Amino acid sequence: MRALLLYNSRAGRGRIVGHISKIVELFDSHGISLKPKELEFGCDPFEGDEDIDLVVVSGGDGTVNFVVNKMRQRGINPQLGIIPSGTANDFAGAIGMPRMIMRAAERIAKGTEHNVDCGEVDGTWFVNVLSFGVLTTTSQQTQDKEKQLVGRLAYIRTGAHDLMTMHPIPLKVKCNGKEMEIDAVMCLVFNGMTAGSIPLAPDAKLDDGMLDVLILEYNNPVTTCFNMFRHLVKGHPGAVHHLRCSEIEIRSTIDERTDIDGQPGPKFPMHIRCAAGSLRLRY
């Protein structure tokens, strides 16, 4: 089996770099020829390596997103393994990958194939979540240097400012043959289960062909935080709308910033669907 290790040396303070030679030896002991390649986000990581059987990605959700989108653009679908080494590793967490690098590498080397869902919005793919509104674009507003220096504290600082400047987002939502209009403060469309390691969609499944959509109605900052807390403790507040669907259309009259897996997302209107079983994960 031929495999490619695509690693983001800037993710998680570069902790993957010191493990690369050991990972190559580990895969070789399982009959897998692994070629390491540092990711350059302006380039095609698969150039010259289109016929691989397995791609192992080391980084956070944004790194996995980048690689999956390049796979789709190339029209290739090798098995995909994930070594979580970024600040945000929600998708890797959803499939139960260990946070320790060598344990994750061993899980992949010994692993089997699992077909899981992937989200798609107007030609762009996401593995974990598409989102917009308060707190949801914190990752793309936080500078990489801050992430490397203080990790999650950088997200908290940016998120606190986000709470104080939140505003209503007028939405028209079409889902399961029904339409609704709502002033929202936050919307998350999950393929995975967590955002920022917070279990906002704990009952979501990666292999059911469905998206889990959470829409939080607009209110003041205190009430908004209270409603989200009630949702987290399964209090089912009326201000939180939970939809399950295979596809959804979302429109807005304002130009709100959106986010997919921690990276800048598309503009409105958006047609979002679940591509059931389209990822060949190895773990």
Language-model regions: role of each:
Residues 1-58, 65, 69-70, 103, ...:
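ATP/NTP phosphate-donor binding region
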Residues 11, 60-63, 85-88, 132-134, ...:
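Short glycine-rich anion-binding loops that position phosphate/pyrophosphate groups of nucleotides
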Residues 131, 188-200, 264:
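Glycine-rich phosphate/pyrophosphate-binding beta-alpha loops
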Residues 175, 181, 205, 215-283:
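ATP/nucleoside-binding phosphotransfer catalytic cores, i.e., glycine-rich phosphate-binding loops
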